[in-house]
Amino acid sequence: WISNPKIASKKSPGFLCLLREMTGIGMNENNPWLNLSDGGHIENMGLYELLRRRCKFIVCVDGEADPRSTFEGQLTLVRHAQIDFGVRLEPRLDDIRLDPKSTLSRTHSHLLRIHYPDAGPGKPKAIGLMLYLKLSLTGDETELLKRYRSISPDFPHESTLDQFYTEEQFEAYRQL
């Protein structure tokens, strides 16, 4: 919870804020206290609100642990965007999907179209683009990444529960 910069309040958020959060009743931008969330209860990439704002170009870095290439986060976003906003995304994920034999992908990225519907005055039908980047290995990585993969076979899809990276682990993800 953070104080609303538009409304001066000397009170602490208190129990009422917790009730609002649990019920969803009265959660709006006119309250003296605002609930900030990473959005993980909807989708984990932070794109939902960018689609609501009808951004023309979005860069998405999908950092979820996805060792079986199910693209759960991306496909959850596709579903919610269509249901909630009428926005249609067209991901083609075959080139990013892991080859089961080599455990490598053909590429790290995909450029996909975003189809925004006509949403009334000032919001005509429009096309946007999303550069989707997936944590993956393609076989042309540096020796540091190859070494880290040899000692950590789950890389780059180690559990996101691990919040305490070693220096080597951090550097491997940074280089990827």
Model-derived features: positions:
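Catalytic domains of lipid- and phosphate-ester/thioester hydrolases
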Residues: 1-176
